[in-house]
């Protein structure tokens, strides 16, 4: 693996919780995923969180969250959360010429949205793996199949790997889920990331700021990044295979982190649930400080 470049970003996240009434919640919490160090991909240079009165929470993947308690929020008021980061992201290029060795025993199990034990997915993984001399070629076959056969369509939901094989279309969540599921079906460890994509003139028309992508564990290389969504066209196919471009910023690992309860980036609970209406809105802004290595 080589590291030919690095990019730095200033990232602003803001969430607002507006109590539209008719009463105030007895209990209200929101858990916000925090960008963290994730070697060798990224390093957090600084982080500022407001308001300060939050609790740090960790999950089974090592993801970190700020838990805020806004119980008793008065009707007609808005609570605002602001988080500012400076993050350095590495460009990584992997040499897959040597693909012999052992694999890991974890990140190979089926789970919600990663249906690697589904008969249709198992059969497809076996078919695509035929006559491939090693694990690296198998993963490339999965990657190429996804690019050639899935029809990209933003749907706003994660329908999982099995859903990606249907006629509804797929976006980054299904592209990633299918790559992970096909890999795990053949015993190849694979992980699912949710994060942010810095959009430039090349990616703005083909992706969204909120993004998902995988990495896979390959012999002699370790964890190797790829992006089947951005690599779905033939002209971009090689650019995003075994190449971590430094426009990807990891927020969480895992398709179903327990703290998020099926959500992405943040989750919000208040009760009694019928006591009032609390509207949560949020946005991200990403500024490139010194974008290089592309």
Which residues does each predicted region cover?
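Low-complexity, Gly/Ser/Thr/Pro-rich intrinsically disordered linker/tail segments
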Residues: 244-294
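Terminal peptide-recognition signature
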Residues: 30, 142, 214
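A short, structured loop/turn motif at beta-sheet edges
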Residues: 20-23, 73-78, 133, 184-187, ...
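A mature extracytoplasmic/lumenal domain signature
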Residues: 34-36, 85-87, 100, 194-196, ...
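Intrinsically disordered, low-complexity N-terminal segments that are enriched in acidic
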Residues: 1-92
């Amino acid at each position: 693996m080589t590291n030919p470049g690095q990019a730095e970003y200033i990232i602003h996240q803001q969430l607002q919780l507006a109590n539209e009434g008719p009463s105030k919640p007895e209990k209200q919490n929101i858990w916000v995923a925090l960008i963290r160090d994730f070697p060798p991909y990224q390093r957090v240079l600084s982080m500022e969180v407001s308001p300060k009165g939050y609790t740090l929470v960790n999950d089974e993947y090592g993801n970190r969250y700020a838990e805020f308690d806004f119980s008793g929020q008065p009707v007609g008021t808005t609570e605002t959360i602001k988080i500012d980061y400076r993050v350095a992201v590495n460009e990584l290029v992997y040499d897959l010429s040597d693909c012999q060795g052992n694999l890991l025993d974890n990140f190979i199990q089926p789970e919600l949205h990663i249906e690697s034990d589904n008969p249709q997915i198992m059969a497809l993984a076996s078919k695509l793996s035929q006559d491939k001399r090693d694990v690296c070629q198998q993963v490339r076959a999965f990657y190429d199949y996804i690019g050639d056969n899935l029809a990209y369509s933003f749907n706003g939901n994660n329908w999982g790997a099995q859903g990606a094989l249907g006629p509804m279309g797929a976006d980054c969540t299904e592209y990633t889920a299918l790559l992970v599921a096909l890999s795990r079906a053949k015993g190849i460890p694979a992980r699912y990331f949710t994060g942010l994509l810095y959009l430039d003139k090349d990616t703005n028309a083909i992706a969204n700021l909120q993004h998902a992508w995988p990495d896979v564990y390959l012999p002699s290389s370790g964890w190797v990044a790829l992006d089947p969504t951005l690599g779905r066209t033939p002209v971009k196919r090689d650019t995003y295979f075994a190449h971590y471009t430094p426009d990807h910023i990891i927020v969480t690992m895992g398709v179903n982190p327990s703290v998020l309860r099926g959500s992405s980036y943040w989750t919000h609970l208040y009760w009694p649930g019928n006591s009032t209406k609390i509207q949560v809105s949020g946005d991200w802004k990403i500024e490139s400080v010194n974008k290089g290595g592309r």
